[in-house]
Amino acid sequence: MRRLALKIDVDTWLGTRDGVPRLLDALERNDARASFLFSLGPDHTGRAIRRALRPGFLGKVSRTSVVEHYGIRTLLYGTLLPGPDIGRREASMMRSVRDRGFEVGVHCWDHVLWQDRVGARDAAWTREQMRLAVERFGEIFGTAPRVHGAAGWQMNEAAWPLERELDFEYASDTRGAHAFRPVDAEGREIGVPQLPTTLPTLDEMIGLHGVTADNADARLLALTAKSSPETHVYTLHAELEGGRLGNVFERLLRGWRAQGWTLVGLDGLFASLDARALPAHRVAVGTVPGRSGTLAVQGDTDAGLRP
């Protein structure tokens, strides 16, 4: 059986409040499962302005019309406006995802803080950020999270073993080609099994190489039409596919089903694997076409199919 796992990153209050219910409806209409990974603390999206000097960031912003997708108000949270506490305000919405049969997991505590700072922070800072997220998850759901997916695919050396210490069973923190066991230079396992994102995201594709919202689904479906590999992980965003790119996502769901893919969450993909038999790979720092900056990638593989 060919399995394509849908990983939904929920970055903002707006995405949680408005994007999540739209995605739930779309998934149910198309008999698809998915994993929703939540940002559980404050929405400080406005502080992402610090990325303006990062090579490629302003180009990505202009290509994907950030204001159109996120709205002015969200882009002021954490700067001119106080950042709403997402987990406090939207606990019932998050529980509704679980109650409708979808996997829920941890994305982060503070999305912008983690994505922009984790690479330079120490173990104590990292532990505190992950502790806050795990504790809030427990308050909302009454159980411990099984899956972690790092904001912006950003990690540091301390975060890998912390996932195991905090009893995550598997994670999707990286970009890569297939599931693997992360190891250090000596071949020692450093964390839980990784289910990396294998396909490009819409915001990486649109605006480059002639890709638009009208043909992005066709470009992605061309990548998944091949007979191999038999598994993929696609990351989508509640603010994009749960917003103005909802029609693109619906076309993708229909197209994947027509190609014979079973659409699962990360839990469904992990359950189909023998975790002990997964190949070992080091985690590297690399780049992905269409995304600014560096991120965690599976070593010795292509970190993401090009559109």
Can you say where each PLM-predicted feature lies in the sequence?
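C-terminal active-site rim and adjoining tail of enzyme catalytic domains
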Residues: 237
